[in-house]
């Protein structure tokens, strides 16, 4: 499969991205974002822009894929960017296709968030919850349990600043990191 254009991964200074992670397509990673080994970020239907201070854990999959009813060759649809805000946590094994994610959200382990969901800010999608509806999730909503029950919490989840600081210090000791960008569109070679 030949690609039409050069796809690029842009990693801001201050981000920690392990070499063992899989990042494909046009992906921009903001400062102070930590991407664990075995995390996957795939931009096949359009770019993915990840904001500042996000935590993407092992085996999390963030994918900007083509909708089921559109094939990649169908009249070349306009690429739609996936925008991820700041201070979000994508826990182990979660699957996220949401095209717009606000700030301070937590997608817990094994949770699934479909393409037509818009997460505002301060939301928690509980472990193993499957969210595949056409809706905007209101701010500070918690979705939990086997039946995906909902409630509104009074405050947003706290940003994971201490955990990010710890991981930014520890991960480079045990994993090779992808190089950050210095204002260019091509990766820096070793």
UniProtKB/Swiss-Prot annotation:
GO terms for biological process: mitotic spindle organization. CDD domains: LbH_Dynactin_6. Belongs to the dynactin subunits 5/6 family. Dynactin subunit 6 subfamily. This is Dynactin subunit 6. Subunit of dynactin, a multiprotein complex part of a tripartite complex with dynein and a adapter, such as BICDL1, BICD2 or HOOK3. The dynactin complex is built around ACTR1A/ACTB filament and consists of an actin-related filament composed of a shoulder domain, a pointed end and a barbed end. Its length is defined by its flexible shoulder domain. The soulder is composed of 2 DCTN1 subunits, 4 DCTN2 and 2 DCTN3. The 4 DCNT2 (via N-terminus) bind the ACTR1A filament and act as molecular rulers to determine the length. The pointed end is important for binding dynein-dynactin cargo adapters. GO terms for cellular component: centrosome; cytoplasm; dynactin complex; kinetochore. Pfam families: Hexapep. Keywords: Centromere, Chromosome, Cytoplasm, Cytoskeleton, Kinetochore, Phosphoprotein. InterPro entries: DCTN6 (IPR027777), Hexapep (IPR001451), Trimer_LpxA-like_sf (IPR011004). Phosphorylation at Thr-186 by CDK1 during mitotic prometaphase creates a binding site for PLK1 that facilitates its recruitment to kinetochores. The lineage of its organism: Eukaryota, Metazoa, Chordata, Craniata, Vertebrata. It comes from the Eukaryota. Gene3D superfamilies: Hexapeptide repeat proteins (2.160.10.10). Part of the dynactin complex that activates the molecular motor dynein for ultra-processive transport along microtubules.
